[in-house]
Every structure is written in C-alpha cells, then in structure tokens.
Regions:
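Small-residue-enriched hydrophobic alpha-helices in membranes
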Residues: 1-27, 32-136
Length: 136
C-alpha cells in the first residue's frame, strides 16, 4: 500500500508538470503533435514509467483545462531538482520554438516562469539559446 501511494504522488507531480507543458503548448492557440511528443519525452525524462505516460498526459490535460492560473502548475516544479527544472525549461523552450516563432504570450510566460521557479536569468537565457540553436 505504501508503494502505491508513493507511485500516485509521483504521477500527480508529473501530471502537474504535464499540465504546465500543455499550458505552454496551447498558449499560442496551436497545440501540435510535435509539441505532444516533446511533452511525452519530457515526462519520461523526469521519471515517468513508459506505461504511465499516456495517463499522466491525460491527467495533465484535465488539470490544465480545469485550472485558471499557472501558479498551480509551478508549485510542484519549484520543488523539483535543479536538473529536472532545467529539463522542463528546455522542453518549454522546445515547445515554443517548435513552430519557429516566439509570440508575445510565449515570451511573457517564460519570463513569469523564470521568476516563479527561481531560475537565474543567465541560466534561462543559456537554456533559451541552446534550444534556439537546436531548432535553427
């Protein structure tokens, strides 16, 4: 029973991360298949079991659809390891650059996230540039 509860907590945490990634993917009104693939890879990279990914994404979509503020998603991410935060931020930038453009809403989202997650602006800039080079 203990292990089941621990697994459920991890899934819930990952569902909130998925919700944040989905929020970013939808902010430009164009949630593409490419963005969903990036989200799945990220969820796997931060500890999901392969067989749980679709369920976690589904729950993330439900959370994102029923939430009205970004703060709910960032609470879980803020307490994650620095390494996992960087993976998530890289994925957020990959989602944003997946259509080769950064619109005003996406740029604003990333500025807000840097502050909410206590990410140094230099680190955020480095992540952005690294992902931008990947996509050029």
């Amino acid at each position: 029973m203990f292990f089941k509860s621990k697994d459920n907590n991890k899934e819930n945490e990952l569902s909130k991360v998925a919700a944040l990634l989905i929020y970013a993917a939808k902010i430009d009104q164009d949630f593409s298949e490419k963005e969903e693939i990036i989200i799945k890879r990220t969820i796997l990279a931060i500890g999901a079991k392969k067989e749980d990914v679709d369920k976690i994404i589904y729950e993330g979509k439900e959370i994102e659809n029923n939430s009205n503020q970004i703060l709910e998603f960032t609470k879980k991410v803020k307490n994650m390891s620095e390494n996992d935060k960087i993976k998530i931020l890289e994925s957020l930038w990959r989602i944003i650059y997946s259509n080769k453009e950064v619109d005003v809403y996406e740029a604003n989202l990333m500025r807000r996230l840097a502050g909410l997650l206590y990410i140094d602006s230099k680190i955020m800039g480095d992540i952005k540039e690294r992902v931008k080079k990947e996509n050029s």
